[in-house]
C-alpha cells in the first residue's frame, strides 16, 4: 500500500473508530490506528502534585498528559525523534491532527508480545527467567537514555518484543 492509501484509510476510519487504539489488516500487513481521546482535566495532576509536595517525594510529581490532539502531537513527535535516532519504534504511515496510523513491529500472523506479557509468562519458569526479561527492559531504557531521550510511559506493557527478540 502506498502513502496515499494509508492516508485515505486513516481519514475514513478514525472518525468511526470507537476505541482509542485499534488493530487492522491492510494489504496483508498489520497496522494500528490511534485516535485522540477526550482532553484530561488538570485536577488529578494538581492533586497528585500536591500530595508529592506534602510527602516531599518529587518523584511522584506528575507529568501532565492533556489528552486530545495535544497527546497525538506529542506521541508523533516522540516516535519520529526516537526513530530518527535509530531506536526501534513503529513506523508512522499517516497522520492528521486527530489520529495516526502506524505499522506493527511484528510479523503478520504472529503475535508480538509485550515485555509485560513475556514477564508474566516467565513467572512459571522461575526468577532467573523473569530477571533476564526485566534486565532486557532495563537495557532498552538505557539505550534510549544513551541518546539523551526518555520514554513517557516506559511500562513493560508498552515495550514490545519483536520477532528477532529485540
Task: Mark where each language-model region is.
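Short amphipathic alpha-helical segments, especially helix-boundary/capping motifs
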Residues: 52-57, 114-118, 132-134, 166
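Conserved ATP-binding subdomain of kinase catalytic cores across diverse folds
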Residues: 11-12, 16-111, 146, 151
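AlphaC helix of the protein kinase catalytic domain
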Residues: 111-125
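Active-site oxyanion-binding pockets that recognize sulfate/phosphate
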Residues: 62-65, 123-127
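Catalytic activation segment of kinase domains across protein kinase-like and atypical kinase folds
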Residues: 150-166
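Conserved N-terminal boundary motif of the eukaryotic protein kinase catalytic domain
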Residues: 3-12
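Conserved alphaE helix
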Residues: 128-140
Amino acid at each position: 500500500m502506498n502513502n496515499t492509501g494509508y492516508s485515505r484509510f486513516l481519514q475514513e476510519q478514525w472518525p468511526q473508530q470507537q476505541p482509542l487504539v485499534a488493530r487492522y489488516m491492510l494489504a496483508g500487513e498489520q497496522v494500528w490506528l490511534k485516535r485522540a481521546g477526550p482532553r484530561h482535566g488538570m485536577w488529578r495532576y494538581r492533586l497528585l502534585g500536591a500530595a508529592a509536595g506534602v510527602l516531599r517525594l518529587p518523584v511522584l510529581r506528575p507529568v501532565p498528559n492533556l489528552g486530545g490532539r495535544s497527546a497525538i502531537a506529542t506521541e508523533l513527535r516522540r516516535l519520529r525523534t526516537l526513530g530518527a535516532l535509530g531506536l526501534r519504534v513503529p513506523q508512522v504511515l499517516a497522520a492528521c491532527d486527530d489520529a495516526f496510523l502506524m505499522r506493527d513491529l511484528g510479523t503478520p500472523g504472529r503475535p508480538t508480545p509485550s515485555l509485560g506479557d513475556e514477564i508474566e509468562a516467565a513467572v512459571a519458569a522461575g526468577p532467573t527467567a523473569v530477571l533476564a526479561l526485566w534486565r532486557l527492559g532495563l537495557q532498552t531504557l538505557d539505550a534510549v537514555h544513551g541518546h539523551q531521550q526518555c520514554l513517557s510511559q516506559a511500562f513493560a506493557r508498552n515495550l514490545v518484543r519483536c520477532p528477532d527478540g529485540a
